[in-house]
C-alpha cells in the first residue's frame, strides 16, 4: 500500500503549492522511492481544456491526451513521473460522474448527497493513481476556507483516517507577511489558517511558510506553539531567484527526514547533485541571449509557462541565460525585434486576435535570418506567411480565420469537421512523427521516429506541399502515413523551424527538449556572428 502526503494551502492562493509538491516528490525520488502526484481542482469545469489562459494559465497536455492544470507541468519537470488524466481531478468531473451514476440507477434509489457520494467518488479518484507507487502526493487546489474545496478536504480527512497515521500525513502551505510599517513578520494569518483546517478535522503535520525572507527561529517557535506542530516541522520557504532552488532549500531544512520518520519509511541517502548543477548554471551563465516570445496572452506569464521553462532548459544545456522578452502580438512594433533580439518564438494559441503581429514577427525572422521557432499555431502561421510573401498567394489563410479563403494552406482536419463540442475533442496527446533524414530536424533529434504531444484541430493542407517545396520549404516531419505535416523548416536559413506538436511539454531542466536546446544554440550562434 502506498503512503499518502496531502498538501493544502492557506491565507491566499498562488503560493506555489505545485512547485512545493513537485520539489518534495523530487527529493523522495532521489531516495529511490516511486512517487506520483495528483492535483485536485475544486472548480466545476470538467477539465482545463476550455478555460481561458487569462483565468487559469496554460493548459498542460499529458501523454494520454488529457487537458490539465499547469501544475502537472511542474510535476513532470521536477520528477520522472508521467502524468495521465487520472492525475488531475476536478469538481466538475466528480459531480459529472456522480450524476451519471445516479441517472443509471447505480445508487439504487438512495438520496445522493455530498457525503457520502461526492466524497466517496473523490476518494476513489485519489486511490486510482496509487498503482505501482510507493508514495502519492495529493495537492488540493484553492485555499482552506473556500466553499468549493470543502468536499475535497472532507474526502482527504476521511481517507487519511482509513489509511492510518503511519500511512498518511498533511502538509499545509501558508503565507507569513512582512509588515513594513511594523518592521516584523506576522504569524496571525497562519494561525487562523491552521485553525480553519483543524475545524474541518485536519491537523497538519508540517507547515511550510512562504515569505519574502527567511523565518527567524522565534517566528518558527511561535507558529509551532499556536498550530500544534513540532518546531522542526515548521519549514521556511522564502522567495528564491529560481524555482529549481526549492528542492535544495527544503532538503537543507531536513524535510526528507521529517517525512520518512512521520510515514515510517526507511531514510535513504539523498543526492541532489543534479539540482545543484542546474542552479549553478542559472546563477553563473557563460553568456546571455534574448528571445522574443510573441503572443497574445503575455499579460499573464503562466499562459506560456511550459514554453518559457523549456527556453530556460535550452539555456541550461548551452550554459547561457535566456532572457524571455514577452511581446504582445496585438501591439507589436516590428522595430522592437531589431533591438538586441537573438531569436523569435511564436507559441501555440487559438483565434484570429493577434494574428497579424505574429505573422509580421515570423516574416521578420525569415527575411533577416534570425533563429525562429513556431509551435502549433506558430507553425501554421509560418505556412501562411510563406504562402503570402514567397508563393504570392496574397489571400492565403487558415480556414479557422477565414473559411472562404481562396488559398486554405491551413485547413481543419477531416475528422474534426463533424465535431460540434469544444471540450476534449481536439487531436490530443502523444502521436508518432517520422523524421526525414538529412534535415535540421533529424540532426537535432538523431532519430527516425519520435513521439510528441499534440493539441490542435487544424493542419497543413497537403494540396500545397509541392508549391512550398519548390521554394525551399522542407517538410522534415510527418505522421508515419505521410498524411499530416508535423515539422516544416527552411533550407537556406540559419534556423527556421515550425512544429505542429508541443515539444515544451516534454522538456525538463535536467533533460532539455532537443528542439529547445538547439534553438538556443542557434540563438547564441546568431548573437556571436551578427550582433
Curated annotation (Swiss-Prot):
It catalyses: UTP + L-glutamine + ATP + H2O = CTP + L-glutamate + ADP + phosphate + 2 H(+); L-glutamine + H2O = L-glutamate + NH4(+); UTP + NH4(+) + ATP = CTP + ADP + phosphate + 2 H(+). CTP binds at residues 13, 146-148, 186-191, 222. One of its GO terms (biological process) is 'de novo' CTP biosynthetic process. The active site is at 376 (nucleophile), 502, 504. Allosterically activated by GTP, when glutamine is the substrate; GTP has no effect on the reaction when ammonia is the substrate. The allosteric effector GTP functions by stabilizing the protein conformation that binds the tetrahedral intermediate(s) formed during glutamine hydrolysis. Inhibited by the product CTP, via allosteric rather than competitive inhibition. Residues 290-529 form the Glutamine amidotransferase type-1 domain. Pathway: Pyrimidine metabolism; CTP biosynthesis via de novo pathway; CTP from UDP: step 2/2. Its EC number is 6.3.4.2. ATP binds at residues 14-19, 71. Mg(2+) binds at residues 71, 139. It is an enzyme of class 6 (ligase). L-glutamine binds at residues 54, 349, 377-380, 400, 457. UTP binds at residues 13, 186-191, 222. GO terms for cellular component: cytosol. One of its GO terms (molecular function) is CTP synthase activity. Residues 1-265 are annotated as: Amidoligase domain. Keywords: ATP-binding, Glutamine amidotransferase, Ligase, Magnesium, Metal-binding, Nucleotide-binding, Pyrimidine biosynthesis. Homotetramer. CTPSs have evolved a hybrid strategy for distinguishing between UTP and CTP. The overlapping regions of the product feedback inhibitory and substrate sites recognize a common feature in both compounds, the triphosphate moiety. To differentiate isosteric substrate and product pyrimidine rings, an additional pocket far from the expected kinase/ligase catalytic site, specifically recognizes the cytosine and ribose portions of the product inhibitor. Belongs to the CTP synthase family. Catalyzes the ATP-dependent amination of UTP to CTP with either L-glutamine or ammonia as the source of nitrogen. Regulates intracellular CTP levels through interactions with the four ribonucleotide triphosphates. This is CTP synthase. It comes from Aquifex aeolicus (strain VF5). The gene is pyrG.
Amino acid at each position: 500500500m502506498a503512503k499518502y502526503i496531502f498538501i493544502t494551502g492557506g491565507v491566499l492562493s498562488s503560493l506555489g503549492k505545485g512547485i512545493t509538491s513537485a520539489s518534495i516528490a523530487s527529493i523522495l525520488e532521489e531516495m529511490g522511492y516511486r512517487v506520483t502526484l495528483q492535483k485536485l481542482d475544486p472548480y466545476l469545469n470538467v477539465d482545463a481544456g476550455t478555460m481561458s489562459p487569462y483565468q487559469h494559465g496554460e493548459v498542460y497536455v499529458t501523454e494520454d491526451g488529457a487537458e490539465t492544470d499547469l501544475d502537472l507541468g511542474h510535476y513532470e519537470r521536477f520528477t520522472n513521473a508521467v502524468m495521465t488524466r487520472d492525475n488531475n481531478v476536478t469538481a466538475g468531473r466528480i459531480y459529472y460522474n456522480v450524476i451519471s451514476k445516479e441517472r443509471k440507477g447505480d445508487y439504487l434509489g438512495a438520496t445522493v448527497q455530498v457525503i457520502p457520494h461526492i466524497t466517496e467518488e473523490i476518494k476513489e479518484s485519489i486511490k486510482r493513481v496509487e498503482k505501482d507507487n510507493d508514495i502519492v502526493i495529493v495537492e488540493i487546489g484553492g485555499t482552506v476556507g473556500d466553499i468549493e474545496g470543502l468536499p475535497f478536504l472532507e474526502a482527504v480527512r476521511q481517507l487519511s483516517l482509513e489509511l492510518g497515521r503511519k500511512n498518511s500525513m498533511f502538509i499545509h502551505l501558508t503565507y507569513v507577511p512582512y509588515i513594513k510599517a511594523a518592521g516584523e513578520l506576522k504569524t496571525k494569518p497562519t494561525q487562523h489558517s491552521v485553525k480553519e483546517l483543524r475545524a474541518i478535522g485536519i491537523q497538519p503535520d508540517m507547515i511550510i511558510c512562504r515569505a519574502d525572507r527567511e523565518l527567524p527561529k522565534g517566528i518558527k517557535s511561535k507558529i509551532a506553539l499556536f498550530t500544534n506542530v513540532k518546531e522542526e516541522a515548521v519549514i521556511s520557504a522564502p522567495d528564491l531567484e529560481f524555482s529549481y532552488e526549492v528542492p535544495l532549500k527544503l532538503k537543507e531544512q531536513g524535510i526528507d527526514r521529517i517525512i520518512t520518520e512521520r510515514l515510517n519509511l526507511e531514510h535513504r541517502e539523498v543526492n541532489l547533485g543534479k539540482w545543484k548543477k542546474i542552479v549553478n548554471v542559472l546563477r553563473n551563465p557563460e553568456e546571455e541571449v534574448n528571445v522574443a516570445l510573441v503572443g497574445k496572452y503575455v499579460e499573464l506569464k503562466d499562459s506560456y509557462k511550459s514554453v518559457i521553462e523549456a527556453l530556460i532548459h535550452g539555456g541550461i544545456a548551452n550554459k547561457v541565460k535566456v532572457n524571455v522578452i514577452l511581446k504582445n502580438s496585438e501591439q507589436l512594433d516590428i522595430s522592437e525585434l531589431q533591438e538586441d533580439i537573438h531569436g523569435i518564438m511564436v507559441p501555440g494559441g487559438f483565434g484570429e486576435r493577434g494574428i497579424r503581429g505574429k505573422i509580421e514577427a515570423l516574416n521578420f525572422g525569415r527575411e533577416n535570418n534570425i533563429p525562429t521557432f513556431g509551435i502549433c499555431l506558430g507553425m501554421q502561421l509560418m505556412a501562411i506567411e510563406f504562402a503570402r510573401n514567397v508563393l504570392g498567394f496574397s489571400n492565403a489563410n487558415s480556414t479557422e480565420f477565414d473559411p472562404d479563403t481562396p488559398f486554405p494552406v491551413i485547413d481543419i482536419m477531416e475528422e474534426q469537421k463533424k465535431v460540434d463540442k469544444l471540450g476534449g475533442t481536439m487531436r490530443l496527446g502523444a502521436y508518432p512523427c517520422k523524421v526525414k533524414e538529412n534535415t535540421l530536424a533529424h540532426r537535432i533529434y538523431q532519430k527516425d521516429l519520435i513521439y510528441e504531444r499534440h493539441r490542435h484541430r487544424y493542419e497543413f493542407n497537403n494540396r500545397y506541399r509541392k508549391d512550398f517545396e519548390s521554394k525551399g520549404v522542407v517538410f522534415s516531419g510527418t505522421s508515419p502515413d505521410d498524411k499530416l505535416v508535423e515539422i516544416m523548416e527552411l533550407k537556406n536559413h540559419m534556423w527556421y523551424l515550425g512544429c505542429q506538436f508541443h515539444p515544451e511539454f516534454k522538456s525538463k531542466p535536467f533533460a532539455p527538449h532537443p528542439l529547445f536546446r538547439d534553438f538556443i544554440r542557434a540563438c547564441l550562434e546568431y548573437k556571436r556572428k551578427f550582433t
